[in-house]
């Protein structure tokens, strides 16, 4: 299966498209201008569409992905603020846009061609709304408020309207700054990375008396035995096998590997690796064979091979990219 890598370069105002070979060798095949600075990108695989959040004109550009991975611009959709995170519901009928600077989460229907329409709901006063992601098993949207040290929970109705759950808020540690979120493949466990205190929270989601509950079961540092004052954590991802989790910090320029306990799904720190300067974004391919980290300040990205047995990373190569790479995605072409 052919794989391509998309890199969003904010200051260069472009998206680069790279081929990724099984060996880990990569080559640039396309560079497409974005008519503005770019931040989040995301893909709906079954539609072969890529969505990019653009500012300062605050819009989402929809691109089609052809059989070779090349992008072609299809549409522009206005949004009411700067996009920081883009995600979708399970059926890919609605697009969720988080805005850290404008403090909101918006819901936009996708038409039959996958084009975002005007938002049908905007929830304001979510201070520092940095990310929002849907738990498909429980039909709950987790909306992260970095500045409030909390996570809001919403059910998604059939009509695309968000409504608060019974337990409508999760509190993280004070001044922790929750930033990004991922789910275990079984969807029963949640991992959130805290930008400001250098920790990861592990949450368990379950039903009790037919009511969905979420409880914190672990808080662990991204760096073993280094409890320092300054952290600047950014991204977090898990392998599709559910055995390994990775998290990075921009202050220390590291990416850490955790093993996931197969009995309780808590994290066990394994190792940290020095990586590119200011690692803002990284991604893992669907086969769990490669991990790529983009250095926002170094204007480079590094590709690692992943050990199937331990999750350890082995450097393969470093490539130069555009100015300020802020988002990276690995996409398997159908």
Curated annotation (Swiss-Prot):
Pfam families from the entry?
Lactonase
| Reaction catalyzed | 6-phospho-D-glucono-1,5-lactone + H2O = 6-phospho-D-gluconate + H(+)
Record's signal peptide: none
InterPro entries named among the record's database cross-references = 6-phosphogluconolactonase_YbhE, Cycloisomerase_2, Lactonase_7-beta_prop, WD40/YVTN_repeat-like_dom_sf
Under which pathway is this protein filed?
Carbohydrate degradation; pentose phosphate pathway; D-ribulose 5-phosphate from D-glucose 6-phosphate (oxidative stage): step 2/3
Keyword hit for Phosphoprotein: no
Keywords assigned: Carbohydrate metabolism, Glucose metabolism, Hydrolase
**What is this enzyme's EC?**
3.1.1.31
State the Gene Ontology terms under molecular function: 6-phosphogluconolactonase activity
One GO biological-process annotation of the entry reads:
glucose metabolic process
TM spans (from-to): none
Q: Name one GO cellular component term.
A: cytosol
What does it do? Catalyzes the hydrolysis of 6-phosphogluconolactone to 6-phosphogluconate.
What family classification does the UniProt entry report for this protein?
Belongs to the cycloisomerase 2 family.
From the Swiss-Prot or TrEMBL record, give the protein name: 6-phosphogluconolactonase
Native source species: Buchnera aphidicola subsp. Acyrthosiphon pisum (strain Tuc7)
Q: Which gene encodes it?
A: pgl
């Amino acid at each position: 299966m052919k794989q391509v890598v998309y890199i969003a370069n904010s200051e260069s105002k472009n998206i680069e498209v790279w081929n990724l070979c099984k060996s880990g060798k990569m080559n640039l095949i396309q560079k497409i201008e974005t008519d503005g600075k770019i931040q989040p990108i995301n893909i709906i695989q079954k539609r072969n569409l890529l969505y990019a959040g653009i500012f300062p004109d605050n819009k989402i550009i929809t691109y089609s992905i052809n059989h070779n991975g090349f992008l072609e611009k299809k549409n522009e959709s206005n949004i009411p603020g700067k996009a920081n995170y883009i995600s979708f519901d399970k059926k890919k009928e609605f697009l969720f846009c988080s805005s850290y600077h404008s403090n909101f989460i918006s819901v936009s229907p996708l038409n039959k061609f996958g084009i975002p329409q005007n938002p049908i709901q905007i929830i304001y006063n979510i201070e520092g709304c940095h990310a929002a992601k849907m738990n498909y098993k429980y039909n709950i949207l987790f909306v992260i408020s970095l500045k409030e040290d909390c996570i809001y929970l919403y059910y998604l109705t059939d009509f695309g309207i968000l409504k608060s759950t019974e337990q409508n808020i999760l509190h993280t540690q004070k001044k922790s700054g929750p930033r990004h979120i991922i789910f275990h493949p079984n969807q029963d466990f949640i991992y959130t990375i805290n930008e400001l205190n250098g920790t990861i929270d592990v949450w368990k989601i379950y039903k009790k008396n037919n009511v969905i509950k979420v409880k914190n079961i672990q808080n662990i540092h991204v760096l073993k035995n280094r409890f320092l004052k300054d952290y600047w954590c950014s991204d977090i991802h898990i392998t599709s096998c559910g055995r390994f989790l990775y998290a990075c910090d921009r202050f220390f320029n590291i990416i850490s590997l955790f093993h996931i306990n197969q009995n309780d799904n808590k994290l066990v720190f394994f190792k940290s690796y020095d990586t590119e300067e200011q690692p803002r974004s990284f991604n893992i391919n669907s086969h769990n064979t490669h991990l790529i980290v983009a250095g926002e300040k170094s204007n480079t990205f590094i590709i690692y091979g992943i050990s199937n047995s331990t999750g350890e990373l082995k450097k393969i190569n470093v490539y130069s990219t555009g100015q300020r790479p802020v988002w990276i995605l690995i996409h398997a072409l159908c």
